[in-house]
């Protein structure tokens, strides 16, 4: 009786394990790209490699609904019917018909292997992690929504970032000679881990910045922006309307 009871359990465990391995091993080779656009519901880890490809590690949806396309030099990763915004579908509620996001609570995890990455745009609420060092002259970052982007290490001459919404940017280590931020909303930026020459910030809203600056900080703000810094930079206030503050850490 005990053997008969154990066998179904083992069979179920093996089935689950095999299913997970299949999901983790699905890899799609793509054409060469330099720019990436990540749409909602997709958590991405970026790693530099010799082959440009996208590996699906986990997904709450059938793999065919995860779209991977390269147009020109731009790689797009999105869920079906959620290329820009998540499609809303009707459902029956106790008080009548209503609508909700098609992929409510859904998330896919992928790893993007790249050779050259110079521009990244993210839409949604997911976390994006750049595991490999970003080493180049210029890097462009655009965020829409409430996502979080983490750079483990960076070495760039110019970093230009535009944020719409409540997104977060963190740089753990490296060097950024010149960084420029344009922020709309309640964004949060922490680049204390990176040595920086000059920082220029234009903020609309209640953004929070932590920076490590050697030479100069310039702030233009409309709202209640807060800039906290390490280093001994010159402070240049541009147009400031509201309660913008600059403090040494």
State what each model feature region is.
Residues 1-28:
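Bacterial Sec-dependent N-terminal signal peptides
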Residues 21, 126-127, 197, 204:
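Short leucine-rich amphipathic alpha-helices used at interfaces
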Residues 24-123, 127-142, 153-162, 172-179, ...:
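Acidic (Asp/Glu) and glycine-rich low-complexity loops/linkers
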Residues 169-249:
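Short, surface-exposed interaction patches in beta-rich subdomains
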